[in-house]
């Protein structure tokens, strides 16, 4: 009869989840910070094309 393989402990699983969630939290914080700086106009790492109005 087939027997499932031995699984890793819950503490190892929780440790992996904590690392993943920590990396996700850092990425989310960077995204929020970048979004705020773009909205307030303080972002200096972006170059936006200026659209010139056509005169007739």
Curated annotation (Swiss-Prot):
Biological process per Gene Ontology, one example term: translation
Q: Which UniProt keywords apply?
A: Ribonucleoprotein, Ribosomal protein
Record keyword Ribonucleoprotein present: yes
Offer an example of a GO molecular function term for this protein: structural constituent of ribosome
Q: Which GO CC annotations does the UniProt entry carry? A: large ribosomal subunit
Q: Which SUPFAM superfamilies match?
A: Zn-binding ribosomal proteins (SSF57829)
Which protein family is named in the record?
Belongs to the bacterial ribosomal protein bL32 family.
Q: Which HAMAP family match?
A: Ribosomal_bL32 (MF_00340)
UniProt-recorded name of the protein = Large ribosomal subunit protein bL32
Q: Which organism is it from?
A: Prochlorococcus marinus (strain MIT 9301)
| Lineage, uppermost ranks | Bacteria, Bacillati, Cyanobacteriota, Cyanophyceae, Synechococcales
Give me the gene this protein comes from. rpmF
